[in-house]
């Protein structure tokens, strides 16, 4: 029993991490587990007060808390081979330029920071843009390392269960959400990305509590002009074009090999994180590049086009 009951800081639930003599198909504590534990304490210690036993289990779990993502990241050993710069090209055919490198590096460091420092300020969404079947969603899923740490179930931000759908996940994909959004919902997405915590009550607790964010959000779109014509700026959205025909290998061609590559990429990112030589935002020069680059992913401004067309054809000496 010693060391078997632990609180999972990612899911905020109690896990049983060792075999305890009965059949289990999930690490998370269930009602059946509680019944077995009550029976165990009654037979071995003569304890029959259910509430006190359940309270004791919660205290023991909290004293033995752990974070599976942090444990995974801390255990990584980098082999010294650079992968962050080449990963998106290898699996999705993206460019290997400084922008693509900085975009992925920023996203990785944001995810690492959210694991070790929940609620830290990070409002960037890496957006993979390209045709269907390129492997964009699979990339985010494998990037999460454990499929249980990934979710693509966040379809609507006005869903009353949106915060519960975030719970227990590290990488969350928001597929086509920006491309199908109107002006009002774009502002809602921006506000959503900027939050550092949520306050809500989970079903088995009595009081609401602040839940600091431990996740980051990735976007994917099959539509090229998915960004809105937004005069207030789209700095949160970092688009990277994918060209599957240029990829070295499809990410699912050998999933085990892809996972090993991605694990080493996380190890490389951890070296940067441990050094402390990073910021969770672009440099001013890269921000300028981003603003220009984002125009390639916006629909044409028809009014601006009409004005430019008029000016090109205008032969007078005064415009107004």
Task: Show which residues each predicted segment covers.
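Alpha-helical protein-protein interaction elements
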Residues: 14-15, 32, 37, 83, ...
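Feature primarily recognizes SF3-like P-loop helicase cores of small DNA viruses
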Residues: 42-67, 121, 148-152, 158-193, ...
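N-terminal nucleic-acid engagement/recognition segments and initiation subdomains in replication
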Residues: 1-86, 98, 102
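P-loop NTPase catalytic core of nucleic-acid-dependent motor ATPases
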Residues: 57-171
